[in-house]
Amino acid sequence: MELRMKKVSVIAAAVAATLAAGSAFAVDFHGYMRAGVGVSADGGQQVTFEKQKIGRLGNEGDIYGEIQLGQEVYNNNGKTFYVDSMIAVTSNGSNDWEGTASNCGTTVSHPDGQDPSATTKCVDDAEFALRQFNVQAKGVLDFAPEATLWAGKRYYQRHDIHISDFYYWNISGAGAGVEGIEAGPGQLSFAWVRNDRNDNFKLGENNPGDTPDAGNDGGAANVNTLDLRYAGLPVWENGSLELGLNYALVNETDDASDAAKDAKDGVMFTAELTQGLDSGFNKTVFQYGTEGYSKTMAFYGDGSWYGAEANDGASGYRLINWGVIGMGQNWEMGHQLVYGVGEDMWDGQDKLETMSVVVRPMYKWDDNHKTIFEAGYAIDDNDGAENKFGKLTVAQAWSAGSSFWARPEIRVYASYLTADKDDNSNAFDGGRSDDTFQFGVQAEAWW
């Protein structure tokens, strides 16, 4: 009996040690996903059309996911080190097997094999991306033990509107910084992030927009973004202010093109007022940008890409209001209002104005069942040439809770999309129609 009890004690101790070790090395698992299936009344798969301007509900034809794994690897005397990582994947959901080698080098004329003249490397395949890989250290700065010192690649203090997937302040990328320094009533953060200019962007007949730099890794102009923010400044009851300044430094090499050498550094200023409400919140944002940041204001940019090819003296600004509020026991509504201006961005261009209105009211039948409506309308006016876009969506949804933000959620939807373009071109059905209907089912989750 005594021997048996000793064996039990040894086993219990081993199990306890294993559990303790598992707790010490527990990995934080977070993520996001959206996926589904949809068709267009014109034939073929559903489309994704101007969702930042007219809303994303019933207007996403892709599959997208993020897998985030992180772990605290050191904790001693108030000092911690955390390693974070994230892989993202996107595809159009056309097949069961979607990978980086799917249908590579094939064309319509060579559907079953390699086409030696093909310029497209892969068709209808999945794309994988390294989105985050960084180290975050807390308690290591003697002058600010509450702050976080970080380096690597990361999502950095992103600001977005969920109902349109519109990121209006987001310089994420590879970099380093210190965030969360207590300074008076708020917190101060500073970062340096690399945001090289993609030289494939083209806009304007007389200005191709390319800023190639053969001497830089990747062949595009090297842009370094310096970011300074002061957040959490109380202004009145339930109201707080965040202020930010971004400086884009174009760092060309001797082998850079003339366009890259002529590119000017730019400044983007952001002020965001957040108002807490009894049944939700509201945010009002003002942004102003010079030089390449003028295009950020005009084309729903977020600051992570810099329009280095913009004309010298270009400028722009943007006003945004968005939020989510409860309206009684069963109704909630999200909205966005956007007005942006870009001026003198390329030769012959004077003023581009963009306006967007999106509303998403939701009725909750019970804790897990809701009906969602979304309507969006947008106008782009470039020196009198107007493009108008619209969308109406109705969806029945089942979610893990009744909140506007409750996820996972499965939704069945029907959408009507329309486009009225200044050049009379058609946006749908391969250029044969100016409107379309689509129907589908989508799941969305974050954890």
Swiss-Prot record:
Q: Which GO terms describe its cellular component?
A: cell outer membrane; pore complex
List the residue(s) that the UniProt entry marks as the site Greasy slide, important in sugar transport.
32, 64, 97, 281, 405, 446
Which Gene3D superfamilies does the entry mention?
Porin, LamB type
Keyword match Ribonucleoprotein: no
Q: How does it sit in the membrane?
A: Multi-pass membrane protein
Q: Where in the cell is it found?
A: Cell outer membrane
Q: So what does this one do? A: Involved in the transport of maltose and maltodextrins.
Q: Where is the signal peptide?
A: 1-26
Reactions mediated catalytically:
beta-maltose(in) = beta-maltose(out)
User: How the protein assembles, per its UniProt entry?
Assistant: Homotrimer formed of three 18-stranded antiparallel beta-barrels, containing three independent channels.
Q: Which GO terms describe its molecular function?
A: maltodextrin transmembrane transporter activity; maltose transporting porin activity
Major site of localization recorded for this protein: membrane
Q: Extract the InterPro entries matched here.
A: G_neg_Bact_CarbUptk_Porin (IPR050286), Maltoporin (IPR023738), Porin_LamB (IPR003192), Porin_LamB_sf (IPR036998)
Q: What is this protein called?
A: Maltoporin
What organism is recorded for this protein? Answer: Vibrio campbellii (strain ATCC BAA-1116)
Site annotated as Important in sugar transport: where? 167
